[in-house]
């Protein structure tokens, strides 16, 4: 029989709030308070506005929630588990083209249009270009050395170049969109600033869509924006998407495609540098790059949490989640579930880490996950091969962290390599 929290007595323990403080302990570990709450896979949680919903920390339970259509992704149904500066009491519906905040059938329509363009085969076809971008960044870094901020010199430029190439965004325009993306993910920025940044990104991509329709090139935006036979007015592309939808989808792909991978690369190199045994193993055997990428994705879990709303009463792990309750799925906790990953707090690049939830699960699983995998698999061994003596230029505790961002990572990563570089 499911446990019904509504039947609890008035003297029941007050539900905890979501722990987010990483100030103490290892910068790669979940907050200590979150680990303490992971003794039960599903528990009650108090949200920033006072709503009482659920926290899911178990790996199997997280997969079940993320795959179940009885849990909605619609923003207007959700409550925020942590306070965000200036966030409204009630969230508005997803903007046009934002497929993350939609359910079927709207989400299914967008997903079908895009999924075929992000297959494993198509992403692997980009490998040679990713290798070229990586080499160019390493050349520039080496010439400017022997010290660098790895974020500015490598972790951010590589995925920016790649997503620009894929979408058809001029890399020379990065000054127009990089700052906007930073604000969009900044939880400490006011709601007005985030909204203004998002609107600015949509304006930029909207201008690009019109340019692509007039003069198409070989890229994803041109493909999606190509006019249909009955769309002389430009109201609908052959893909069936309006200009507003194209701008929303393009903005989402641009922001997600560069920010998450950039933070994975920066934080991933940081994790390797403070785990020299793992770093040496990867340097000695570049064929471990694929397994290393999966393990770093599991170990670091930079995009967390994922939110859902129960559309009806649902039982998960013997707990009855009531219709209308928001469910916070902690990717960090699920990826450290010892029932799924033995010794989960240990970085082990030889581990079989497939099955982690860093790209989500179910119908909203990340479209760009194969691209991120290829980028990491190419970039990490190339960096270590180029700079055999790569090391932190500051003590680990002095590396600044992005603790108030929706995507966790390092603000900067000062590194040096010295005379042993090739």
Name these PLM-found stretches.
Residues 1-422:
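Cytochrome P450
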């Amino acid at each position: 029989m499911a446990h019904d929290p509504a039947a609890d007595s008035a003297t029941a323990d007050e539900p905890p709030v979501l722990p987010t403080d990483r100030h103490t302990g290892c910068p790669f570990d979940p907050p200590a308070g979150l680990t303490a709450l992971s003794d039960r896979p599903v528990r009650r949680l108090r949200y920033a506005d006072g709503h009482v919903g659920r926290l899911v920390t178990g790996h199997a339970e997280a997969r079940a929630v993320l795959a179940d259509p009885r849990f909605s992704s619609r923003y207007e149904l959700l409550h925020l588990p942590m306070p965000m500066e200036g966030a409204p009491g009630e969230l508005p519906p997803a903007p046009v083209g934002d497929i993350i905040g939609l359910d079927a059938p709207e989400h299914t329509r967008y997903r079908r249009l895009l999924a075929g363009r992000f297959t494993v085969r198509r992403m692997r076809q980009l490998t040679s270009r990713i290798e070229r971008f990586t080499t160019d960044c390493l050349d520039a870094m080496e010439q400017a050395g022997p010290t660098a901020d790895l974020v500015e010199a490598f972790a951010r430029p590589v995925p920016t170049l790649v997503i620009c190439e894929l979408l058809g965004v001029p890399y020379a325009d990065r000054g127009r969109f990089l700052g906007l993306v930073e604000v969009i993910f900044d939880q400490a920025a006011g709601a007005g600033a985030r909204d203004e940044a998002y609107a600015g990104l949509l304006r930029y991509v909207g201008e690009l869509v019109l340019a692509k329709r007039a003069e198409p090139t070989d890229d994803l935006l041109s493909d999606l924006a190509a006019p249909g036979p009955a769309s002389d007015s430009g109201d609908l592309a052959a893909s069936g998407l309006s200009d507003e939808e194209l701008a929303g989808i393009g903005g989402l792909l641009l922001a997600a495609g560069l920010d998450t991978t950039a933070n994975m690369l920066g934080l991933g190199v940081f994790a390797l540098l403070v785990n020299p045994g793992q770093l040496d193993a990867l340097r000695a055997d570049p064929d471990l790059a694929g397994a290393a990428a999966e393990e770093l994705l599991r170990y670091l879990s930079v995009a967390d949490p994922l939110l859902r709303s129960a559309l009806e009463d649902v039982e998960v792990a013997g707990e009855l989640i009531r219709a209308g309750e928001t469910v916070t799925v902690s990717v960090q906790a699920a990826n450290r579930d010892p029932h799924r990953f033995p010794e989960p707090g240990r970085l082990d690049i030889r581990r079989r880490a497939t099955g982690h939830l860093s790209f989500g699960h179910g119908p909203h699983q990340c479209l760009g996950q194969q691209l991120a995998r290829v980028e990491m698999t190419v970039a990490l061994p190339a960096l270590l091969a180029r700079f055999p003596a790569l090391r932190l230029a500051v003590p680990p505790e002095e590396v600044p962290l992005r603790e108030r961002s929706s995507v966790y990572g390092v603000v900067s990563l000062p590194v040096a390599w010295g005379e042993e570089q090739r």
